[in-house]
């Protein structure tokens, strides 16, 4: 596991054969994991039953919006008086396997965790790193919630990194949620996406290439101060897409004005934002978020870059503490 050791084991699992054996998600059934699925969990450190032997781990797919969405659910025993369930929404190019440290921290703080791979990411179906419309992300979230509503414990909390944060912003604004109607009691946004950095130039480039290309090569930026994490993404993670899909940028272009013109809502959010983030236009995005939500608590991290969930250890500690403190209120 990249965050535990410098030596990365060669993955003795293969995405296609894992998918062939995936079962529907049902936390009422205790299934034995296949040897290959155990190897996948070990590769990303999702084998958290080693650190937390009392935790039950369930996984499988949910059919949502034409997709088969891979769901991971970690459940504490009743005897530990769990505080509810944290939903984790990952960012663009990410997957649940990169969020193990956050899952670990939530379990340690007494929360169950539910996390799923977005369409086009990880073990979920869909064209890699593509989406037809950001409405698909909303439909998947609402179908996942509907599927698990009677199967997992409340209250619910949510944390989203980057595009995951965008999905939560959209959920709250498009449904005009307030404190009474939202499925989530508390929401934390980590380096949330509204506009990416260099948005004007990106739109011009997109207009030029859209008639000719379906994707362009991904550049792996230094979006974290954790060199081990960056090396893992570039060199060792078999679930990393190597190209940006033009459809995703097309969808983002439609989504940004929709969010920026949305009516404000009476809901509080906590935003954690690195001031060295070169991925999103964070100053603009914070202004938009302040205008949209009744109360916005900001935790700025002066040396923080974009991938806050996988930042250098001291910065990551501040990020995780803010999340847990917000949910524990």
What is each PLM-predicted segment?
Residues 304-317:
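Catalytic histidine-centered segment of alpha/beta-hydrolase-like enzymes
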Residues 290-307:
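Catalytic histidine neighborhood in serine/cysteine hydrolases
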């Amino acid at each position: 596991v990249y965050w535990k050791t410098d030596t990365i084991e060669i993955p003795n699992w293969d995405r296609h054969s894992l998918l062939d054996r995936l079962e529907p998600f049902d936390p009422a059934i205790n299934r034995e994991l296949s040897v290959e699925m155990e190897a996948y969990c070990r590769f990303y450190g999702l084998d958290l039953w080693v650190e937390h032997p009392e935790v039950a781990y369930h996984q499988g797919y949910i059919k949502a919006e034409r997709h088969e969405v891979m769901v991971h659910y970690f459940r504490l025993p009743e005897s530990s008086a769990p505080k509810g369930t944290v939903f984790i929404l990952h960012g663009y190019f990410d997957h649940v396997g990169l969020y193990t440290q956050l899952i670990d921290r939530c379990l340690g703080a007494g929360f169950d965790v539910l996390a799923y791979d977005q369409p086009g990411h990880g073990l979920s179906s869909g064209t890699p790193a593509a989406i037809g419309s950001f409405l698909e992300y909303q439909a998947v979230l609402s179908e996942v919630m509907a599927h698990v509503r009677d199967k997992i414990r409340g209250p619910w909390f949510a944390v989203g990194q980057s595009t995951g944060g965008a999905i939560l912003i959209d959920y709250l604004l498009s449904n005009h949620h307030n404190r009474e109607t939202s499925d989530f009691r508390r929401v934390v946004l980590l380096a949330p996406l509204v506009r990416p950095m260099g948005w004007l130039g990106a739109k011009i480039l997109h207009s030029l290439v859209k008639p000719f290309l379906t994707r362009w090569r991904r550049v792996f930026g230094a979006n974290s101060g954790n060199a081990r994490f960056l090396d893992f993404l570039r060199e060792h993670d078999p679930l990393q897409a190597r190209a940006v899909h033009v459809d995703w940028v097309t969808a983002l272009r439609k989504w940004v004005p929709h969010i920026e013109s949305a009516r404000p809502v009476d809901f509080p959010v906590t935003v954690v934002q690195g001031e060295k983030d070169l991925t999103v236009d964070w100053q603009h995005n914070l202004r938009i978020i302040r205008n949209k939500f009744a109360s916005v608590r900001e935790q700025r991290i002066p040396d923080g870059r974009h991938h806050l969930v996988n930042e250098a250890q001291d910065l990551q500690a501040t990020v995780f503490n803010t999340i847990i403190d917000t949910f524990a209120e």
